[in-house]
Structures are given as structure tokens and as C-alpha cells.
């Protein structure tokens, strides 16, 4: 469920003194069962968060999918938000397995399920992030180059570009399908990334785990968090700057949805990425390959990030105009206003408003 390797060989397989800071290792070797450390009430709280995300995410994104297919006109915006809702819907569907993993305190579904599940999770994760970038860039181009957008911004091209986003997401998560495996640690089976060979010595194996962890964590942080965040934020700034130059007094309005989306993305996913970096630091500096409490904290921060996917449908509807006004509208009209940028287009200077 995390973006980096989580399991290692058992204590007896490693050279003495390699993991000098992992005191939990010797303490647990006398137990034949799977024992895991707890961090207060973090495990049950994580299960509650995942449960809420499953219900809200499946229902909310499912409703958006149904309405964009059957109740709304097919435009560039509805194509983009359909694929974003699909990615969030897929991520929400995968959460029951994540919850089972956390409750069981170990991976019990086998190696191939480990490969397929983690690949599916990160396909949804990267697709959602890349689609947010795609939507932001699309709206930015529509504002900065309205004439070009009028001639080239078509539903067919948007569909092909969205398909390309899914291919990019598949490429970004393909390493999980090849290198994910399972291994027991202190009686607990975990699903983790393994770039190494079982025939290597313990010291070489440790170095391989750390090297793979560095590559995976930095790549995930840049491609799955910092990069999308920078692009979305830049697009929001460029939109507002262009409209201010053209004398639109309500320049903050079209920026509002992008601002809320990027803020929600940052708030909910930043803990997960910070924990990833802390986990990397502990492995590189403290030579700590595995720590059960860090694994639980990583799982909890991932659960918090999943809340973002379940909230996106509500952000589409309730951001842009006053909540009270949209609450009494039909849902179709509210989504149309969000996806079609009705309030933005109707307020742009005439002749400059981009069209679908």
C-alpha cells in the first residue's frame, strides 16, 4: 500500500550489527506469531478513515461517473472530469483490501495479489494526479490562448490525451508489477519492493534495499507530489494574472476551483510524502531497514491521502458559487457549472472566452 519497500529478511538472515537502531528485532524473535507494535489508537483510527473514504468515494465518484455519461453533454471538461472521477473511483474500490491489510497486521493474500493490488492502487494514484495536471493545463491554455483553444480544443483530442495520461500512469507504476513480492518478518508477511536477489550476501542485500528505496521514494515524491503540485499551482497563478491584466474584477473566481483542488491535494497527500521522506532518512542514516511503527504511520498517512479522492466530487459541485445557491440547484446543473466553467465563461470579456 505504500510507494516503497516495506519488508526485509528476518533477523537471523542478517549480519550482526547491521540494523543497529532496530531494537524491536531481538525483542520479537521469541514469538512464533505475527506481532506488531502499535502507535496509540492509530490503527483503529486508520480503519475508520478508510471506511469513510470507501463509502463516500465510491458513492460520490460513482455518481459523477453516471452523470457525466448519461446526464451531461460530452465536452472537453466532462471528458476530463469523467477520467478523474474514474481514477478516484478505482482508488476507493481498492481500499477494502488496504483495510484488511491493516487489520490483519500482515499481507495474507499471496505474492501475485500483492503485485496486482499495489499496481492497481498506484495506477489510480498516478492517474488521478496526472489528470489534475491535465485539467489545470487545459484551463490555463484556454485562458492564455483562447483563439488557439477555440480551434484545437476538441472532445476527440481530449479523449486521446486522457488515454495518454492513463498510459503514463501505467508506466509510472509498472515497477510494482515486476518487483513487488512478499516476505516474512518476525512472523509477519509483508508486501514490498524487492530489487535484489536472494543469493546475495546480507550486506549487499541491505545496500540494494536502501538504493532501491532511495530511487523509489525520490521518484514518487517528484512525479507523484511535488511535480503535479508545482504545475497546478503555476496554472492557477497564470489564469488569475491573465484575467487581472484584462480588467476582470472577479479574477479570483475561476481560480477558486483550482486553488481548492491544489490545496486539498497538498493537505491530504503531504503527510504521506513527508512520512516517505522520513522513512528514507531512517533507512539511509540509521540503517533501519524495517520498523513496524513506521509502517503503521505510513499506512495511516496513506489513508489520509485517500480522503482527497473521496472529497473531489463535492469540491466540483460546491466550489465556485455560494454553497447555499448550489445546494438548491439540481445536481446536474451544479456539475455542469463546475465542469463547463459557466460562471467563468459568462464573466470573461467578450471575445476572449474559450469554448468547448
Swiss-Prot record:
Q: Write down the InterPro entries for this protein, in alphabetical order.
A: Formyl_rcpt-rel, GPCR_Rhodpsn, GPCR_Rhodpsn_7TM
> Which parts of the chain does the record assign to the membrane side Extracellular?
1-44, 101-116, 179-220, 281-300
Transmembrane spans:
45-67, 79-100, 117-137, 157-178, 221-241, 258-280, 301-320
Q: How does it sit in the membrane?
A: Multi-pass membrane protein
Per the UniProt annotation, where are the glycans attached?
30, 199
Question: Which CDD domains does UniProt cross-reference here?
Answer: 7tmA_FPR-like
- According to the lineage, what is the superkingdom? Eukaryota
Which cysteine pairs are covalently linked by disulfides here? 114-191
Query: What cellular component terms from Gene Ontology apply here?
Result: plasma membrane
- First-listed, main subcellular location of the protein, grouped into a coarse class: membrane
Q: Where in the cell is it found?
A: Cell membrane
Entry-linked SUPFAM superfamilies: Family A G protein-coupled receptor-like (SSF81321)
Sample GO molecular function, one term: N-formyl peptide receptor activity
Cytoplasmic side, ranges = 68-78, 138-156, 242-257, 321-356
Tissue specificity, per the record, is:
Expressed in resting primary human macrophages.
User: Which keywords does the record carry?
Assistant: Cell membrane, Disulfide bond, G-protein coupled receptor, Glycoprotein, Membrane, Receptor, Transducer, Transmembrane, Transmembrane helix
Q: Which GO terms describe its biological process?
A: complement receptor mediated signaling pathway; G protein-coupled receptor signaling pathway; inflammatory response; phospholipase C-activating G protein-coupled receptor signaling pathway; positive regulation of cytosolic calcium ion concentration
Known function:
G-protein coupled receptor that binds to several ligands including resolvin D1 (RvD1) with high affinity, leading to rapid and transient activation of numerous intracellular signaling pathways. In macrophages, enhances the RvD1-stimulated phagocytic and clearance functions. Macrophages migrate less toward different chemoattractant stimuli but phagocytose more microbial particles. Prevents the increase in Ca(2+) and activation of ERK1/2 used by histamine and its H1 receptor subtype to induce goblet cell secretion by activating PKC and GRK2 to counter-regulate the histamine receptor.
Q: What's the family? A: Belongs to the G-protein coupled receptor 1 family.
Protein name (Swiss-Prot/TrEMBL): Probable G-protein coupled receptor 32
Q: What is the lineage of its organism?
A: Eukaryota, Metazoa, Chordata, Craniata, Vertebrata
Amino acid at each position: 500500500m505504500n510507494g516503497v519497500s516495506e519488508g526485509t529478511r528476518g533477523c537471523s538472515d542478517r549480519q550482526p550489527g547491521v540494523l543497529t537502531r532496530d531494537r524491536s528485532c531481538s525483542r520479537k524473535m521469541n514469538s512464533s506469531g505475527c506481532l506488531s507494535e502499535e502507535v496509540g489508537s492509530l490503527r483503529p483510527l486508520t480503519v475508520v478513515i478508510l471506511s469513510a473514504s470507501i463509502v463516500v468515494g465510491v458513492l460520490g465518484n460513482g455518481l459523477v461517473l453516471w452523470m457525466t455519461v448519461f446526464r451531461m453533454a460530452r465536452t472537453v471538461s466532462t471528458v476530463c472530469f469523467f477520467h478523474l472521477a474514474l481514477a478516484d473511483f478505482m482508488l476507493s474500490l481498492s481500499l477494502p483490501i488496504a483495510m484488511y491489510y491493516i487489520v490483519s497486521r500482515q499481507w495474507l493474500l499471496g505474492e501475485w495479489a500483492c503485485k496486482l493490488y499495489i499496481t492497481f492502487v498506484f495506477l489510480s494514484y498516478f492517474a488521478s494526479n496526472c489528470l489534475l495536471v491535465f485539467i489545470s493545463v487545459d484551463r490555463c491554455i484556454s485562458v492564455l490562448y483562447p483563439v488557439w483553444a477555440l480551434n484545437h480544443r476538441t472532445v476527440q483530442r481530449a479523449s486521446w490525451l486522457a488515454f495518454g495520461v492513463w498510459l503514463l500512469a501505467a508506466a509510472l507504476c509498472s515497477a510494482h508489477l515486476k518487483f513487488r513480492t512478499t516476505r516474512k518478518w518476525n512472523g509477519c508477511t509483508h508486501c514490498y519492493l524487492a530489487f535484489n536477489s536472494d543469493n546475495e550476501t546480507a550486506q549487499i542485500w541491505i545496500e540494494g534495499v536502501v538504493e532501491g528505496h532511495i530511487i523509489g521514494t525520490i521518484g514518487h515524491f517528484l512525479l507523484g507530489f511535488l511535480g503535479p503540485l508545482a504545475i497546478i499551482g503555476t496554472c492557477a497563478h497564470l489564469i488569475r494574472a491573465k484575467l487581472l491584466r484584462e480588467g476582470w474584477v472577479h479574477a479570483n473566481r475561476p481560480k477558486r476551483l483550482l486553488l481548492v483542488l491544489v490545496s486539498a491535494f497538498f493537505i491530504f497527500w503531504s503527510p504521506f510524502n513527508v512520512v516517505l521522506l522520513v522513512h528514507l532518512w531512517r533507512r539511509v542514516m540509521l540503517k533501519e531497514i524495517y520498523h513496524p511503527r513506521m509502517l503503521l504511520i505510513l499506512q495511516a498517512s496513506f489513508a489520509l491521502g485517500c480522503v482527497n479522492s473521496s472529497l473531489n466530487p463535492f469540491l466540483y459541485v460546491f466550489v465556485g458559487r455560494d454553497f447555499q445557491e448550489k445546494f438548491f440547484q439540481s445536481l446536474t446543473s451544479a456539475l455542469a457549472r463546475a465542469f463547463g466553467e459557466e460562471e467563468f465563461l459568462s464573466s470573461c470579456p467578450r471575445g476572449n472566452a474559450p469554448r468547448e
